[in-house]
Amino acid sequence: MILRRLVLAGSLLLATAFTSAKKADSPIIMATRFDHEPINLFYFGDSDVVMLQDIKNGDVYVSRDAGVKWDMVNLDGLKGQALSLWSHPTDRTKAYILGKAGKHWVTNDQAVSWHEFSADVEFFQSLFPLVFHGKDSDRVLLQGHKCVGRDCKEVTYYTTDGFKTVDILIENARGCNWAVSTPIFGDGLNLSKEVNDRIFCIVPGLQSPWSDYNRLLYSDRFFKQDSGTEAPLDSGRAVSGVVRTASVKKYLLAAAKSARTSELALYVTDDGSQWHRAEFDGQRVEEDAYTVLESTNYSIQIDVVAETPSAPMGTLFTSNSNGTYFTRNIDHTNRNGLGFVDFEKIATIQGIILVNTVKNWEDVEMSALVEKKIISQISFDDGRTFQPLKAGKHDLHLHSVTHLSNSGRVFSSPAPGLVMGVGNTGGHLKDYYDGDLYVSDDAGITWRKALDEAHKYEFGDQGSVIVAVFDEGRTGKISYSLNHGKDWKEASLPDGIKIRARILTTMPDSTGLKFLLVGSSKRDSDVEHYVISISFTDMEERTCGKDDFETWPARLNEKNEPDCLMGHKQFYQRRKADVDCFIKKKFQEPVPQFEPCKCTVEDFECDFNFIRSTEGKSCVPARSLPVPEGACKKPNDKYMGSSGFRLIPGNACIREGGVELDKQIERVCTDTLTVPVSGEIVVQKTFFTADNYKGYFYLERKDSSKGDDETVIMITSELQIYITRDHGKNWKEIFPGETITRIVPHQYFDDVAYFLTNSGDGWYTLDRGENFRKFKAPIPPNQDKLPVLSFHPERRDWLIWTGAEECKTRGPQCHSVAYYSTNHGSEWHFLMQYVRRCEFIKREARGSSNNLVFCEQFENENPLNHHLQLLSTDDWFSEKKVHYNNILDFATMQEFIIVAVRGEKPEDSLSVGVSVDGETFAYADLPANVQIPVQRAYTVLESRTHAAFLHVTVNNVEDHEYGSIIKSNSNGTSYVLSLSAVNRNTYGYADFEKMQGMEGVAMANVVGNVADVEKGAAKKYRTMITHNDGAEWALLSPPSKDSEGRDYSCSTEGGKPTDKCALHLHSYTERADPRDTYSSPSAIGVMLGTGNVGEYLTLKSDADTFITRDGGITWQEVRKDRYQWEFGDSGSIIVIVPESRPTKTLLYSLDEGKSWKEFQFTEVEMLIRDISTVPSDTSRNFLLWGNEVGNGKKPGVAAVNIDFSNLKERHKQCVLNEEKPEADDYYLWEPMHPFQPNGCLFGHRAKYHRKRPDRDCFIGRELQHLDSIGDICECTRSDYECDYNYEPQIDGTCAPVPGLKPLDPKLICTEDPKAVEWYEPTGYRRIPLTKCEGGKQLHHIIPHACPNKEEEFLKKHPGLRGVGLFFVIMSPIGLAAAIGYYVYTRWDGKFGRIRLGDTGSGGFFASDSLLISIPVAIVAGVVAVATALPLLASSLWRSVRGYARVPGGSSSQRVYSSRAAFAAQRADYVGVVDDEDELLGAEDFDEEENDDRGQV
């Protein structure tokens, strides 16, 4: 949404007056000189009081005589402190001065007096500072930031009494709005007091600060008695990703964007309670690609970008009366890159719109280099039809909003029917300085030239006076006309002043005879600024009488007769053009007169649940219609229902004798919601002319995207590429006859994919395969198996292409060159040569430039020297910065950039370099207790919890690999051990997986016989689980009985697992398809896996299938044998199918796996190789991939669509009431954490929406599963982890690493200039993720003042002085000595340990003791995945978040890969974060230098 306020840069300081000679037949002109250009100039309504601001000096000025004399506003504390000046949009008496130092001022009497108020807030451009109530001018929101040093957070204040009192409304809100935000909001709806008090605020998500998780909350009590309720934007459900709200006329709009798409959803309300999603006739609405325009009282006008953003054009849409359905008015409207649209409604006249469109739009779509040819068009029927502007017989084209030359409206004013503009006649619009001034006095029907050259212009005295000033350079005169622009006179500026005009304006209603001209004049080397008043009040003109006026029809039809709109004709009493008089009705705007018309087709719109038909002549159902009570007992019954039309609300047409399109008609019951369903699962099998498939991936439609497609792209073993838009029911081959060698789905946007050839030609789709566009690369793709395309995380169309140069013959001259494009390949620009990989670094978590790019380049552009430099730039390498001279690789994540830096001695060692901002790097301190003789390989895991996670390889012997997971502090530089002996395979991937959708649950397979493995024995695995993000790990509890009701051969102790009897599951390194994860991001609490019960994990062939419904606490055996599984409809459907054996049937569950039903999907046995659904697991469709193997088999690979949407139990949508979440088909589920009986995890309790398993309904689009974060808990030892150089013990204790010292705690004083104190090390540090408050402060016990900060320290600790300070310091020392002696003499552990103790009483070591804490390490990563689709031998690789493959030594083909989104082929199977989690390593460096690197 484009919200803008037009100002001019500059300021004023000194005022000096000049006066021209007074003449009876010309205006009086007086000039006031200022040293700085004035800004924020405005009139108070219905007055001659004008204000402006000197922003440079921080002063404000006021004039009470329409700009003749100016006085500085002198208030205590205001001098030099004014930051901005604002007028109230609807109250003509109020204005506001926002100050620089927390003091602000308000006037309620047009600047006669001022009231000071205080609010500690700083103002940034990201928030609109003042938000006004539409009906009560005393109600205002004040938005900004509260800053302490560099740490700033959003804060919103509110007042209900005009700032007599001010209170904090909410903190950390990203924008707030009153529900009643305009004077006409809710008119005729009898709004309740609650809605009048209602405020909507955009706030961060409950578990994530990123904008994709923003929520829209509302409160009717100023967030005092509640924390807000989520607005039910979409069919009664809350929506995440709300990016902004805006008000226009009687509507409030909210825009939301889902993660991994640039497409927006717009939601509209006209009563503050009921929201509807706006539909745009199939048009995509992109982020920052639409503009809410000036609208009417009965519809919204929105311009939506249609095509190339680099040469933006739009489509103009107009809504129905409730803002739900938008119809297309005109295509190819002219826009600019700032979102301004060449669109204006003619003031005071209903239905007349003036737009500019692009004549050569087809050429512009083909190339951004083509200059747009712009033409002007006008509509007299509210945008239904458009026609050219005519000046005589010639087409006229006028400069509009995209070329603003004045403040206020471009063409019109409240002067009835008078319209002006700068432009030219001919085939299209020329440059502004090639234009002339044109005028129309019949609201745009006919035009004539007024003045040569471009001029600024303004209307006065209801159009009796027009003033114009030359706008192509300096001028010393003005021009004016007293007869609608037919004839013109000139008047000179006083004292020979020549200015460059900046603003020409008058009072807002254009009823006065005074004007203001702002301009600048250059004398010698000085620039002088003037505010010039122009007054026609003393001219010898009589006052107009009755005979001087005419009845003027505002609109004419094609027969030149008064036209009807909204049920009436509109007329004005307007002064005749050629009479010699002034109206002199100051502050009295012209009042329209209306004459009613009989109802016609134009007076009706589509009713609720209906949309315009394709031909636009009828209204057809948009969805199944609600059934009338008592009707539709049988499918063939009929009932009386809506015709599809309704009279537009507010339309005043006469019913009698007119058209009645809204009369009820007879409808058939098949249109209703109660159509009986077949109750059957529908199957559609498709065979392909290939023996197998090489890969598939989903282009998933997100919640904010339009349509209902479920798009899959599949590649066969014969290299044919097929697409389905309906999840496999119908397939179509794309690019037949083309040799596609690479398919590269966008790393960050699921709507986008690129299809490449070896020649450099390619195609891309921006809309999930609905359309394909061709592009040409600057050079062919590289031949080094480097990533060809790199993507920007936030700018969808920004690309980096790494291609091959001088490579026709493979020789030493062949090298890689990087180019970049900001318009998806329409234009390319050179970036750097001799590169290996280049990436955009911008992330939402860091404030870096959008242009920040990192590249790996061979030193001295010589790949033979084996040294890769890490370089960065934010100006496309006009300048560059060298971060490291010899690196192996780097990984970019949401919060960190981690670099594998090669060591000097030994040469094959690695160090870790870390940066949080992309500017400054520091080396990481790895824990000494992770015994790694030489750091040679590590895997970068997830970093969304304000900490980085690494898997560090401890044993690198082939087939015997394992390592440790370590976790960093908040800046990624200091690491502690989390879990040892985690299994790793030869390629560097670890058996580690986080449960999706829940905090704190992760599973890992560890090597259970480390000592034997070190001697050469085969690895034996055990599965461990954590429910508190690594604070404690335990074996999986086995089921009490198997699926056949029999006991297992081993036994547990009281139901708890033992070393001899636990459940073990096969993990990532054993999966044929890495996308087959245990859990789903939408099936909260549910996991499936295959494995066995016993001492260790056994062979896969011996595995059975298990399920948990409570986050891994308890498990149940589903079936003997191993099955493949998939979640559908957010877990309300679970489908399993046998793995590695032929079958005709599948099993499905509708109650989270409690019971299962068998379904036969084929007559011929099939061997199913995979089962899939959309990445979010929200569809009711599944795909089985396999081959027929039984009698009567057909050749070729088959894709079998299994559709549950017609199943009776899944045909009705579940009901969720956000205000009463347990009232209908859902309940609130609170995860249980077995080691924390109070339910706290990271200092809070969480509650999730889950469907009741016994309800027969479907969930539909993905829920915001997390309903709330309940109680904030007091800090306990579980909210802390071991500090650097402290390590967790096997028995749960925390001890110093022998022989090592903690980090110097005084470093904070030098690293943070704001630091006042440092604390003595305690061995503990607070977990970055915890929200706990109060309680145990284990990390801060004994404070000390930083050097030269003693005074601030004593102010912070006022009691620590003199004797008191002595005892505070000495008491802990004495107590520590006493405890030390006691422990040394009484405790067998002696020094070096802090015992965990039991939960009961335990003296010093009880669970609540301040002296001890359990080490907590967050394990919140995702499984590393090689997201590969081999299309042509090692060349087709898909990565949603980034992929890089670097073969290492011997035959290992060491992989350095993204682990953040194997979801490539399945997009988001693990719901991975936007980190590019990678495997970094160094093996056999000499060989690795000459090896190839894999495809991104």
From Swiss-Prot:
Lumenal compartment residues: 22-1362, 1431-1496
Domain of life of the source: Eukaryota
Renumbered ranges of BNR repeats: 61-71, 377-387, 438-448, 480-489, 722-732, 819-829, 1106-1116, 1148-1157
A Pfam family hit: Sortilin_C
Transmembrane segments: 1363-1383, 1410-1430
SMART domains linked to this entry: VPS10
Database matches in InterPro entries: Sortilin_C, Sortilin_N, VPS10, VPS10-sortilin, WD40/YVTN_repeat-like_dom_sf
GO cellular component, one term: cytosol
Residues in the Cytoplasmic compartment per record: 1384-1409
Keyword list, A-Z: Glycoprotein, Golgi apparatus, Membrane, Protein transport, Receptor, Repeat, Signal, Transmembrane, Transmembrane helix, Transport
Glycosylation sites (chain numbering): 190, 297, 322, 971
Compartments where located: Golgi apparatus, trans-Golgi network membrane; Prevacuolar compartment membrane
Function: Functions as a sorting receptor in the Golgi compartment required for the intracellular sorting and delivery of soluble vacuolar proteins, like carboxypeptidase Y (CPY) and proteinase A. Executes multiple rounds of sorting by cycling between the late Golgi and a prevacuolar endosome-like compartment.
Family: Belongs to the VPS10-related sortilin family.
PANTHER family: SORTILIN RELATED, SORTILIN-RELATED RECEPTOR
UniProt name for this protein: Vacuolar protein sorting/targeting protein 10
Species for this entry: Paracoccidioides brasiliensis (strain Pb18)
Gene giving rise to this polypeptide: VPS10
